[in-house]
Structure formats: C-alpha cells, structure tokens
From Swiss-Prot:
One GO biological process term: sodium ion transport
Role of this protein: NQR complex catalyzes the reduction of ubiquinone-1 to ubiquinol by two successive reactions, coupled with the transport of Na(+) ions from the cytoplasm to the periplasm. NqrA to NqrE are probably involved in the second step, the conversion of ubisemiquinone to ubiquinol.
Protein family according to the UniProt entry: Belongs to the NqrA family.
Signal sequence, start to end: none
EC number: 7.2.1.1
Known catalytic reactions: a ubiquinone + n Na(+)(in) + NADH + H(+) = a ubiquinol + n Na(+)(out) + NAD(+)
Subunit structure: Composed of six subunits; NqrA, NqrB, NqrC, NqrD, NqrE and NqrF.
UniProt xrefs under HAMAP family: NqrA
Gene Ontology terms for molecular function: oxidoreductase activity, acting on NAD(P)H, quinone or similar compound as acceptor
Protein name as catalogued: Na(+)-translocating NADH-quinone reductase subunit A
UniProt keyword annotations, A-Z: Ion transport, NAD, Sodium, Sodium transport, Translocase, Transport, Ubiquinone
Amino acid sequence: MITIKKGLDLPIAGTPSQVINDGKTIKKVALLGEEYVGMRPTMHVRVGDEVKKAQILFEDKKNPGVKFTAPAAGKVIEVNRGAKRVLQSVVIEVAGEEQVTFDKFEAAQLSGLDREVIKTQLVESGLWTALRTRPFSKVPAIESATKAIFVTAMDTNPLAAKPELIINEQQEAFIAGLDILSALTEGKVYVCKSGTSLPRSSQSNVEEHVFDGPHPAGLAGTHMHFLYPVNAENVAWSINYQDVIAFGKLFLTGELYTDRVISLAGPVVNNPRLVRTVMGASLDDLTDSELMPGEVRVISGSVLTGTHATGPHAYLGRYHQQVSVLREGREKELLGWAMPGKNKFSVTRSFLGHLFKGQLFNMTTSTNGSDRSMVPIGSYERVMPLDMEPTLLLRDLCAGDSDSAQALGALELDEEDLALCTFVCPGKYEYGQLLRECLDKIEKEG
C-alpha cells in the first residue's frame, strides 16, 4: 500500500448517496471537441445528417486515423465552433437504436488477440480516444506503444462515486477490459485502487496497487509518480475504470457501450445520488428539476477541475464521471475576512470553521477575493504529495519559464494534478491553464 499524507479532501456539502439510480431521459448528446488536446477535426458529418451509434463523426488530422464516433443514434442538429473555428461540440438529437456493430469474441480469446486486431477495433469504434498519454494528456498515436498502462479504479475527487459499486456490477466486462489492455502492451497494466476488493484479471502483467490518503491519492498522475515516473522518453497511458468496462463490452458483445454511471451532487442538488446516463449526455436534460431555485453553475466533472457546462458545452465530458452543481457566489461580504467565519472553510485555518471537525460547507463559485500576487506561505506544499518543489514549479509556470518547469517535473503533470494548488492559492492563479500553456510550448519546441 502507498499512503499519501499530503493533500486535501474538500469538505463540501451535497455528498451523493452511493446507490445507482436511473437518470432522466436524455434527448440530446454531444462530443466536445475542446476536450481533446491539440485535436484538429476533419468532419465526416454535417447538420441534418442521420447517424448511427458508433458511426464516425470526425477524425483528427493531427493524429491520423484516430476516429471520434457518435455516442447515440439520431440526427446531427448542431456543429458548434468558437474562435478561430475551433470545434466546440457536435450535437445529436437522440432517435432510434441503429448502431454500427463490430466483431465479438469469447472471454477466453481476449488475452490472446493480436495487438493490431485490438487496435483496429478500438479505433473503428471510437474507444481508442479513452486512452490518454502522459506527458501531454493526448490521445495516443495509433502506431505508438507504451510499457505502462494505468487503470484509475479509485476516485478521490470531491463528491465522486465509489468505483467499486460500478465495477462490481460489471465484473465480467471489467475483467475482459483488463485482458484487452494486457494484450495492448508489452509492459505492465497497473490497476490502482483503494483498499476495496475488485475483480482481478489472471494475466501476469496486470498488477494491483493500493493507494490510501486524501485527494489527489486517486489521480493517475499520483499513481504514475510512485510506480512509473514519466518523462519525454518514458511515456505512460491512462484510462478510467468505466472505459475499461466499455472496452470489455465492445469485445464481448460487438457493440459500443456508452452507458455512464455518474455522481450528480453538490450543495444545490435536491437529491444528490448516482445516476445512470449516457456518454455526452445533455446536462440540461440530466439536471431538469433536480436543482434548488436560484442562480447555479452546472459543472461537468469535479468542482476542482471540471468545466462550466453552458451553451455549446452543456454536455457530459468524455472523461468526466460526475456532475457537480454550485451556487453562483456573486454576493459581496463587507469585511468578510474579519468575521469569525463559523460556516467558512479555510486551509490556513483563518476561520472558526476549522474547529468543527466533520462539518460540510455550502461552498459557492466565489473565489473570496480578487487576483493578487502569488504568496508562498506553505499552502502548496501542504496539498502536493508528489516529490517536487511546488512553489518553485508554480513560480516558473507563472513566469512562462518552460525549461525550468520541465526540470522541476512539469512533464509528469496534467491540469488535474495542480487543481488543489489552484484551490489554496491566495493569488487566485489558474495553474492548470498555465501548465497547459507550458506543456504546449515544450511539445512545440521538441
């Protein structure tokens, strides 16, 4: 067991009940183009086209051969683009059950399948995009290979679902997915989990590793740091546990599996719980009549790293397994910093709220102050469990010094790995965005 001592479990109200319920009927689904780092689409559909489930919608011209497919059958009703014609979303009005089918196999055949057969089926179905590289967090090139695949079978994000509930409901598919991954690499498959019991693959290159401690103990970046540190030469891939299930379903049934069990939670959700929905689901549909009155912000993903789901982005993200909802914090509080703060949370123990152990707070979107200079008072070190110098790294990110940032370990990181640093930062810096700019610069310069 690897125990993480530094970190932070955010004490936010609205914890979901860990029972899986059926979600609302979803009328629209979408693929969100900006989720895929560096992707440039070649469109295969236009507005008005009828599509089958698993039919190709677009390809990545910068990563030849990588295909993005429809999560449901229906009619393409929107192709949304932003500044510089960046693809924001391809929206499908759900109708019918037509789908593209693929080869199916017996469970005993999976571990012996040829690697090219596996790659071809994953690419054609669109499930290849479930894999992400580290460094850079991109969809792997089809011809690339890795010696380490990390399965994130735990989740320490605030308000998250317990993965074991979902995995144990789909044991056969989860094991089949692990067998597929074991055949996809000559190296190891690291299944990273909490102390709970999960179904195990019999393949010799599939290893289980237990992590314990506060967030970010459940992040792929943390697991890689301790088990297979990445750099420009050592490239690892990661995948979440629900996509492992989808891998297994694809090869066992010959059909694209796009079901998702997500956490719908937060301080302004009427009944926080786990709901069964579909990949790319419209969050307007999913949250209909689920929220308390007032101005709220719906977030696809965690409150720490998710995206504001509004307009053309109001859909469940490809890599997200929760929907979080917060009240918009627009009210200004006179001399709020001088108040006792019984109902306020502070990492630096600035308020009385820290005296009440176990208290959950009705957090809002307020940043509790304006932008200011970066202040190194030890907060970053308190929430960073990785063996690196966070204050120095964050300073270099702010300064745009990619050479120094790379020397300090920036290539190991993804935006989610710096989310807690953003949360505790007195200067209100968005370190995830700064990290992405740095990684783009490093990749461009080679």
